[in-house]
Amino acid sequence: MTKKNKSAIQRRLIPTYIFLIIVSFISVFPLYWMISAATNTSTDVSRGRILPGSHFMENFHNLTSQQPLWRALGNSFFYAILTTVICLLICSIAGYGFEVYHDKGKDRLFSILLLAMMVPQVATMVPLFKMFSKAGLLNTAVGFILPIISTPFMIMMFHQNARSFPVDIIEAARIDGLSEVRIFFQMFIPTMKSTYAAAAVITFMNAWNSYLWPKVIMTDNKAMTMPMLIANLITGYVTDYGMLMCGVLFCSIPTMVVFFVLQKQFAEGITGAVK
């Protein structure tokens, strides 16, 4: 390829680069504004100041003195990690079973499972609250994670990825005398690391950012999560936006770290699910 052709191609790519720069700016600016607002006073934020200030420690002190920040962070980590581990185990077993075992009625059951994705969460919230209240599960980890540890989307995701798992390996393992449990844990799980990583990212972020159900089920401030804490910072009279953005920053850091660490595996797992 001649230099003239390369120059022509580069000129044609200029609009694409400009578009990507604009999209990147639109995507990154809210994150920058959140960090900047966490370092400014509420008055500066209200006036539209976008440059970083020097009031982060003041906002942080106000946040920790007025709200149980560390308790909320600990609760969110505990609920999110526990939900992720249990959800991955249950949904992967279900997705694996739907693909590997060929029983009568399997397809109908899977269709019913997919139809459950059409039911909004708010439609089942009141019945679930009454059931959990009678069972004494209010303000408990079980009450938090039970409705979300098995989601149709996660089961479908593992089911789609399980299609790439070689059936011949399963048959060979059975001939060698491996139990179904050992086949799943020693052969299926190691080959589906990307799927597990993608599912872990989605489940962790959903559990961490969950607000409506914890707000209903958690009536004790000792069980408060980070989204509930942030909601408490928004009052009907005067809202300290600097302190609010400081809380949002602490709430956002864990999910950003999880995504950045597992972004490669996340992309691979999602790609495998849509094939």
Where on the chain are the PLM-derived regions?
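A structural signal for multi-pass alpha-helical bundles of membrane permease subunits
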Residues: K4-K275
